[in-house]
Amino acid sequence: MDRDEIVSFLDEFLNISAYPDKSKNGLQVEGKEEVNTIAFAVDASLDTILKAKVFNADMLIVHHGIIWGGISYVRGLIAKRLKELLVAGINLYAVHLPLDAHPEVGNNVQLLKLLNLEAKEPFGEYHGVKIGYIGEFDEPKPLPLIAQILAEKLPAEYVKSYEFGLQEVKRIAVVSGGGGFAIEEASRKADLLITGEITHEDYRVAEDLRVSVIAAGHYATETLGVKALMGVLKEKFGVKTVFIDNPTGL
């Protein structure tokens, strides 16, 4: 399959031009023109790149790429990562905020699906765009039950509940990854915020605003989008796909 055809589809399908993002979304590193195997991962770490080589991947699609705001020098770690990609001819495609926000395969829509919820409205303003969503149960549910469901569908060791608000919740706000910035907005619009991880200061903000938070793992909540995107590309282009699981424990 032609690389440029895949890239063109991804750029349009993910609407990457609509999101101001520190990440340089799109094809970050150009490799082989012919793509037969695509690897998917959360992070373009050196270890992930080396694993992509083992799978003979022609393209690596990630949520977190290697270019954030630009490259000042090609030395050290960035040089090592680029060298492995270029020597192997692996195309690197990164999609950050557009994959969080995508209405079909996005991390946050997929996170709601774990609870059998649909996205009712955009949520979580970040750099001028909404990257999360709010879903709503027909009837309020016990907060511990929601945490239990997430622990059954994501690695249980990542799921942590911070119960500062209602014990019965109906409106659920989701922002995958580091969603602590959305706590204040959640206090006004939802009964519960589900995110990946929160900081020490985020904890105090949630405590003071009396809004409950479930942190289900930064890494774990951001595997959802790349896995969903993997299915789309496999069906559309008939390429071989592989997900490289390289958890951080965070």
Curated annotation (Swiss-Prot):
GO terms for molecular function: metal ion binding. A divalent metal cation 1 binds at H63, D100, E222. The keyword Metal-binding applies. It holds the Pfam family DUF34_NIF3. InterPro entries: DUF34/NIF3, DUF34/NIF3_sf. A divalent metal cation 2 binds at H64, H218, E222. One of its GO terms (cellular component) is cytoplasm. Keywords: Metal-binding. Homohexamer. Belongs to the GTP cyclohydrolase I type 2/NIF3 family. This is GTP cyclohydrolase 1 type 2 homolog.
